[in-house]
């Protein structure tokens, strides 16, 4: 595997309580929202103080900016499955993709080219063989920082990665597929992820909720917690049937879940297809 070295000064040592090879337990995928030149410039700028371990351009070239043994500055404030501050425990991969800030004239997100995805799969296979990165810990930036980040986006082909043995993608339950319109093309059904429209703004139910809504909401929060999302503070510990749940605050977390697991159904709500999918994924992650 050919790798182009383009060192960044933005890194720090990993925790020293274990050999660094054992500390690496997460793989975090991002998009740059910039072209290659601007991406490399920013990720190597001392003033910006951000970085990642690898950048993959649209033609599939792989650049290494930070050595695996060091912690790159890519995750920021983050949480996944009980672990906070994932810079210390992760490898960060940035894909050159213009993302949500650069939609085409039809409002479509730019697809991930097949050459880029092929290189990503090769790199992920290499990293998973080298370090104890389990399938449950292959995540997107939006999974670990849902209130701040939306990359790699709903157009990222998680299915394609899962078919290559990287991460997980269980088939959609029939009810969720029918309700969400997922029976059509899924992102990742081909070598290159297809274009997909940008997500709408979240619409969340007003509180207080009805007893039935509150029960579904509480079940959804518990499912997201079981999967690994940070739902701390969103469940106020009260009686769910009394509507003591913060629907507005958790909408970004629901959207992050939908971007990952229900990418053609983005509304920030625990509606029936979302709740069904969340409970299915939670069972897989338990």
Can you say where each PLM-predicted feature lies in the sequence?
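Cell-envelope/ECM-targeting effectors and their regulatory/trafficking segments
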Residues: 117-132, 148-286
